[in-house]
UniProtKB/Swiss-Prot annotation:
PPR repeats lie at residues 47-81, 82-116, 117-151, 152-186, 187-221, 222-256, 257-291, 292-326, 327-361, 362-396, 397-431, 432-466, 467-501. Belongs to the PPR family. P subfamily. Pfam families: PPR_1, PPR_2, PPR_3. Keywords: Mitochondrion, Repeat, Transit peptide. Its main location: mitochondrion. The lineage of its organism: Eukaryota, Viridiplantae, Streptophyta, Embryophyta, Tracheophyta. This is Putative pentatricopeptide repeat-containing protein At3g16710, mitochondrial. Coiled coil: none annotated. It comes from Arabidopsis thaliana (Mouse-ear cress). One of its GO terms (cellular component) is mitochondrion. It is found in: Mitochondrion. Residues 1-48 form a transit peptide.
């Protein structure tokens, strides 16, 4: 086995490119530990008893600074603590995601001549893979071999996770094959690591294949494995396969969690299967799986999409009663639902509640309100909301301007829209084709067809291409003025530019 591992390791190292000197972990001569200045025998005794007391009490609730302080006490203790104690501490710091710190502390241990265990090296390998470049992981793998350690499945799974972290999918797949070739039996962590990576990068067929292999290789998937697949399938619209997986995991007595249910609920909402989403929510509650902010957000969004606004509001308040507090996205979703249904005052009530609860409205929230007021024929109030934005740390973006301009034009306030458009041009704002199309339409409504066509022609010099809506708007403007020849010429140019006319061109 050792020989096959060594051969496999050699081929893995060959796959790395950038072996630079600065990336290598230096393992110094243990004798240099003698040069470290210590503070005397009494200090050693105090430090020794102090760190032992902390270790006895457990490291679960240890804060980062306390962990560093504990390491300092441990290295100043005499005799030095066992490598098991050091390994436990490194593991705790690694769980805090302070990977560079773990690597640095390990280097200090090497200087002090504290010989590591294989599990110590595996913790460091995990940290190297999540904080550094591939070449450093290769270097550390070589150091492990020099120290006499034969990398095990945990080592290679960490390296596999590193490849996934660096988005090197082909290398991850190749390493997985090498792991099999070296005689290792991948466990659920190894499989799940690669499956999650494949799903994230939309290689779903390969991920499903790998999932099916697990049973034949004697590795049982867990809820994390299922969640990776369910989420990946839902993201590409394969909700039927995802629902089958949910049934499969329940048959195997693997309990789905909030991530499993939320992925499917969100997928059902997106494909218009609101009833199925609500049924799944009820199953979730019956199984005592508590919804989170994402679950509630998906359901509220679905209810708003179907105009079930009072039910959406009930779900919103139920969420609060259950101790799950809405964020600005959920507030905005509900406000948008009310505004879209012309219930702007109800939307404003939610907006005021949002402010009272200390949730800060963002640019999208204000844009939704502006659109709502324009929709109910109150463009002046919409402009008041617009004017408040900058002072409330939610500066308007191009979409906000477009919504306001469109609302003003649709409500007969074209001159005001033109003034705002002129202001945007003077400020050299990043005006897009939607903005120009709105203004061209507004000009045509005012009878300023020549000005509209001048603006239309200027688009090409600005490096901006009209879309089918821009063409249709301009053609309609010509037709309303009886300029049939000009409309026909523009219609031909539209087809030359590769745009297929829509039904509004023929009206």
């Amino acid at each position: 086995m050792r020989r096959s591992i060594a051969t496999g390791f050699a081929s893995i190292v060959k796959g790395f490119h950038l072996h630079s000197h600065r990336h290598r972990l230096q393992i110094s001569n243990p004798r240099t530990a003698a040069s470290l200045s210590l503070c005397g025998f009494c200090f050693w005794i105090r430090a020794f008893s102090s760190y032992r007391k902390i270790l006895r009490n457990g490291l679960h609730n240890l804060q980062f600074n306390d962990a560093l302080d504990l390491f300092t006490r441990m290295v100043h203790s005499r005799p030095l603590p066992s490598i098991i104690d050091f390994t436990r501490l490194l593991s705790v710091i690694a769980k805090m995601n302070r990977y560079d710190v773990v690597i640095s502390l390990f280097e200090q241990m090497q200087i002090l001549g504290i010989p590591p265990l294989l599990c110590t090296c595996n913790i460091v390998m995990h940290c190297v893979c999540l904080s550094s470049q591939p070449c450093r992981a290769s270097c550390f793998l070589g150091k492990m071999m020099k120290l006499g350690f034969e990398p095990d499945l945990v080592t290679f799974t960490s390296l596999l996770n590193g490849y996934c972290h660096w988005n090197r999918i082909e290398d991850a797949i190749a390493l997985f094959d090498q792991i099999l070739g070296m005689g290792f039996k991948p466990n659920v962590v190894t499989y799940t690591t690669l499956i999650r990576c494949l799903c994230k990068n939309r290689h779903l067929n390969h991920a499903v294949e790998l999932f099916n292999q697990m049973g034949t290789n004697g590795s049982r998937p867990n809820v994390v494995t299922y969640n990776a697949l369910v989420t990946g399938l839902c993201e590409i619209g394969r909700w039927g396969d995802a629902a089958w997986l949910l049934r499969d995991m329940m048959k195997r007595r693997i309990e789905p969690n909030v991530i499993t249910f939320t992925a499917l609920i969100d997928a059902f909402v997106k494909v218009g299967k609101l009833m199925e989403a609500k049924e799944l929510y009820n199953v979730m509650i019956q199984m005592s799986v508590y919804p989170d902010v994402f679950t509630y957000g998906s359901l509220i969004n679905g209810l708003c999409m179907y105009g079930l606004l009072d039910e959406a509001r009930q779900m919103f308040y139920l969420m609060e009663r259950n101790g799950c507090y809405p964020n600005e996205v959920i507030y905005t979703t509900l406000i948008h639902g009310f505004c879209k249904s012309k219930r702007v005052e109800d939307g404003m009530k939610i907006f005021y509640e949002m402010s009272q609860k200390g949730v800060v409205a963002n640019t999208i929230t204000y844009t939704v309100l502006i659109q709502g007021y324009c929709l109910v024929g109150r463009p002046d109030v919409a402009q008041e909301v617009f004017n408040q934005m900058s002072s409330r740390r939610a500066p308007p973006d191009i979409r906000t301007y477009n919504v306001l301009l469109d609302g003003l034009c649709c409500n007969g306030k074209v001159e005001k829209a033109l003034m705002i458009f002129e202001y945007m041009r003077k400020r050299e704002m990043d005006i897009n084709i939607v903005t120009y199309t709105i203004i061209i339409q507004g000009m045509c409504k005012l009878g300023k067809v020549e000005d509209a066509f001048d603006l239309f022609c200027s688009l090409f010099s600005k490096g901006m291409k009209p879309n089918v809506i821009t063409y249709t708007t301009m053609i309609s403007g010509f037709c309303r003025r009886g300029l049939i020849h000009e409309a026909d010429s523009l219609f031909k140019k539209m087809k030359e530019d590769g745009f297929l006319p829509n039904e509004s061109v023929y009206k």
